[in-house]
Swiss-Prot record:
SUPFAM superfamilies: Periplasmic binding protein-like II
Gene Ontology molecular function: metal ion binding; molybdate ion binding; tungstate binding
Main location: membrane
Gene of this entry: wtpA
Lineage: Archaea, Methanobacteriati, Methanobacteriota, Thermococci, Thermococcales
Matching PANTHER family: MOLYBDATE-BINDING PERIPLASMIC PROTEIN, MOLYBDATE_TUNGSTATE-BINDING PROTEIN WTPA
Protein's UniProt name: Molybdate/tungstate-binding protein WtpA
CDD domains for the chain: PBP2_ModA_WtpA
Residues forming coiled coils: none
Length: 340
């Protein structure tokens, strides 16, 4: 009997050790580089997926999120050679332009947005802005008013904000781009072609620039900054006041694509030229993703009903259906429209 007890103890200890090893083998981490404007909806999708993965897949998932401007998110992979599972950007064209074919072989267009001008009741002339939104460019031109946008070289919201001001110049027939951009920064234009130097210099203390658009939210909330160009979804998520811009300039109307396309910007950071177009977000799973199968399962979850509802609850309209290009994984094909 005395011999049996130690043997039983050894067997019990073995089961405990094997059980621990087994549970560790079912843990996984997903690394996501994403646009700052996706932070809130993505975190909510991740929370739901964590429960789903534990219950349905038997996997304990943790997420390593890195929010940045979308250009910077892509360059973490292409220039810095950092490993990630998923890249999600605010301008889908960055994926085919900079990541295919070396880093991924497919991408999905899944959500839309528009540019607005956001502020609070602390902002100078806030009441006037609300009552007379068509005077926005006059208010931003006043010497006691500060405004901001994100860095065009790092963030699509930045280069879109600059293009919105050039489109406004065409739409209103007023020198809006010259007054708000060329006089305050070293960004310049030749006709409808805009050039953003690799190092952008701010020449007027009224103008504030940050790496990504969400970096500007706190400045407006605190009253340190009067107005910002930002995505409508972000303004609503943070309960900011905002004015909408005409469809001809807000980059949110697919019917205005031809008018938008009259304007382009060349980025000093990449050397690439980007035409103004309706805002569409893109997402992909990388070829060398550390947890590629699980990343595709997460993408399937995001594109499904639960993911769609989370995005729409956060004021970000989902494409119906999402549109996919390239070597689309079979796991998501029924959720998307595949195009050549």
């Amino acid at each position: 009997m005395r011999k049996v007890i130690p043997i039983l103890g050894i067997l019990l200890l073995s089961f405990i050790i094997l059980g621990c090893l087994g549970s560790e083998s079912r843990e996984a981490r997903l690394i996501i580089f994403h646009a700052g404007s996706l932070s809130i909806p993505l975190s909510q999708v991740e929370e739901k997926f964590t429960k789903y993965a534990q219950e349905k897949l038997g996997v304990k998932v943790t997420f390593q999120d890195e929010a940045s401007g979308s250009v910077k998110a892509v360059r973490k992979v292409t220039d810095l050679k950092k490993r990630a599972d998923i890249v999600a950007v605010a301008d889908y064209t960055l994926i085919p332009q900079l990541m295919i074919p070396n880093y991924t072989d497919f991408y999905v267009l899944f959500a839309t947005n528009e540019i607005v001008i956001a502020f609070t009741n602390k902002s100078k002339y806030a009441d006037e802005m609300l009552k007379n939104p068509d005077k926005w460019y006059e208010i931003l031109s006043r010497p006691d008013v500060s405004f901001g946008f994100s860095d065009p070289n790092q963030d699509p919201c930045g280069y879109r904000s600059v293009m919105v001001m050039k489109l406004a110049e065409l739409y209103y027939g007023r020198p809006i781009f010259k007054e708000l951009v060329e006089k305050t920064t070293n960004i310049y234009s030749n006709g409808t072609r805009i050039y953003a130097p690799k190092e952008i210099i701010i020449k007027d203390k009224r103008v504030i620039m940050r790496p990504k658009e969400t970096d500007l939210v706190g400045l407006v909330e605190s009253g340190s900054l009067d107005y910002i160009f930002i995505y409508k979804s972000v303004a609503k998520q943070h309960h900011l006041s905002y004015i909408t811009l005409p469809d001809d300039i807000n980059l949110g109307d697919f019917n205005k694509a031809d008018f938008y396309g009259r304007v382009s910007i060349t980025l000093g950071s990449t050397g690439k030229t980007i035409k103004a177009k309706p805002i569409v977000y893109g997402i992909t799973v990388l070829k060398n993703a550390p947890n590629r199968e699980l990343a595709i399962e997460f993408l399937r979850f995001l594109l499904g009903n639960e993911g769609r509802k989370i995005f729409e609850d956060n004021y970000q309209e989902f494409l119906s259906p999402p549109v996919a290009f390239g070597n689309v994984p079979p796991e998501i094909r029924r959720l998307v429209e595949v195009k050549d």
